[in-house]
């Protein structure tokens, strides 16, 4: 079943009875016979279970709505120009996002470089961009690029409830990196570090909160 906070709870003969010699952990994760998975998800009408995120990563908006950032972030990353998406919304009136651009897609779609000649290494992609007399800021600060992404965001927003929809976004001047502490070695985003590194950009998204938050 799904708890009030969205966490998936399991019960059955195939579920463990507890942790070996660790009653404290057992009492934490198994309450009234229900195993608390730590996953957030939903169960459809046919009984299929869908995991949408981890409970520890769930945002709670200022109006008390639970928001699973990972699902929204992965959906927005389907936009070709987007490399990374970082959702903001915990204790906020509405959701916003930080986007980084996919330089490989810029080289292919905006400059017309043959995809077979585009290097995989991000630093080499930046060099190719510069070799073609462009800088990344030519695109991160480009109004047409912003409008193109905004159109895609508005379409994808229709897949989510109003509290989950991205109302504002910022295109960052560079991608997230391992060296800056924003990505793990397996390229998962580190939320705390991104919040710290880009705090001013995040604050700017909430200077004026005149949006429809439903």
Where are these regions (language model features)?
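Short Gly/Ser/Thr- and Asp/Glu-enriched loop/turn motifs at secondary-structure junctions
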Residues: 54, 90-94, 164-166
